[in-house]
Regions:
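Conserved ABC ATPase "signature" region
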Residues: 103, 107, 112-132, 184
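Helix-to-loop junction immediately C-terminal to a conserved catalytic motif
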Residues: 59
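Conserved ABC transporter NBD signature motif
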Residues: 67-79
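The feature captures the beta-strand-to-loop junction immediately N-terminal to the Walker
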Residues: 44-46
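Short coil-to-helix segment of the ABC ATPase nucleotide-binding domain corresponding to the Q-loop/switch region
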Residues: 96-104
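Conserved signature/switch motifs of ABC ATPase nucleotide-binding domains
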Residues: 135-138, 156
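Catalytic Walker B motif of ABC-type/P-loop ATPase nucleotide-binding domains
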Residues: 161-164
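Hydrophobic anchor residue at the start of the ABC signature
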Residues: 86, 150
Length: 259
């Protein structure tokens, strides 16, 4: 019998509570999740189900109230370059150019100048921003800014890319184009991606596995392998069948909570 694969990320019985105006808010309750190296996993659920909280715990920005988050079996206690975060609002330095935003991580880590420069140029080209390397964030479209944010994480030598609804504020055409580009980058780099979304179609289109979370407090309701071949056609009967199944799983539990 084969040995089980060691997960790159493991969430063990994680609960998280917050204090808000004198009340205790249960954001997560006994969450368990294993993510293998190279997987693309999407987290989906209604607002307030703890998706972003779970992502922040994996990033090291938040600590669990109980349970533990692990990377390669070692406790996650603080942010580290191995886990890079991409936010919906880009989180770029407005006073730095595209090139300097991407160079910030390697430079801060003491990477030799020539090596850092080569790394930056590699990822600038990978995200298609070679012509805009000297531009500033305010001179870029939303989609271009998000490409910079992705390149910045990649240039910092991340093994795990954590994405918190990164395309949620973009128009439909730009969002679809960036989904395709993200899958191309993932295929080339073999990185592990954990992607938060509230859109069922986006979750199915991108993921190896779609993890459904439920609110009040947030729990892992189901973990669903996506068996659709890549590249995926959102207009195909197979995709629509999967969308109906996933929609049913998502909304049936929410209906029970509301009843």
């Amino acid at each position: 019998m084969a040995e089980p694969t060691l997960p790159i990320i493991e969430i063990r019985n994680v609960s998280k509570t917050f204090q808000l105006q004198g009340q205790t808010i249960d954001a997560l309750k006994d969450a368990n999740l294993r993510i293998n190296q190279g997987e693309f996993v999407t987290l989906i659920g209604a607002s307030g189900c703890g998706k972003s909280t779970l992502l922040r715990i994996i990033a090291g920005f938040e600590k669990p109230t109980s349970g533990e988050a692990l990377m390669w079996s070692k406790p996650i206690t603080e942010p580290e370059p191995q886990r890079g975060m991409v936010f919906q609002d880009y989180a770029l330095f407005p006073w730095l150019s595209v090139r300097d935003n991407i160079a910030f991580g390697p430079t801060s880590r003491g990477v030799p100048r020539a090596q850092a420069r080569a790394t930056v140029e590699h990822f600038v080209d990978m995200v298609g921003l070679g012509r805009f390397a000297d531009a500033y964030p305010h001179q870029l479209s939303g989609g271009m800014r998000q490409r910079v944010a992705i390149a910045r994480v990649l240039a910092n030598d991340a093994e795990v890319v954590l994405m918190d609804e990164p395309f949620g504020a973009l128009d439909a055409m730009t969002r679809e184009r960036l989904q395709e580009e993200l899958l191309e980058i993932w295929a080339r780099t073999k990185l592990t991606v954990v992607f938060v979304t509230h859109a069922i179609e986006e979750a199915i289109f991108l993921a190896d596995r779609v993890v459904v979370m439920t609110p009040g407090p947030g729990r892992i309701e189901s973990d669903n392998p996506m068996l659709l071949a890549r590249p995926r056609d959102i207009a195909s009967p197979e995709f629509n069948d999967t969308r109906r199944v996933m929609s049913g799983k998502l909304h049936s539990h929410h209906g029970k909570k509301a009843a």
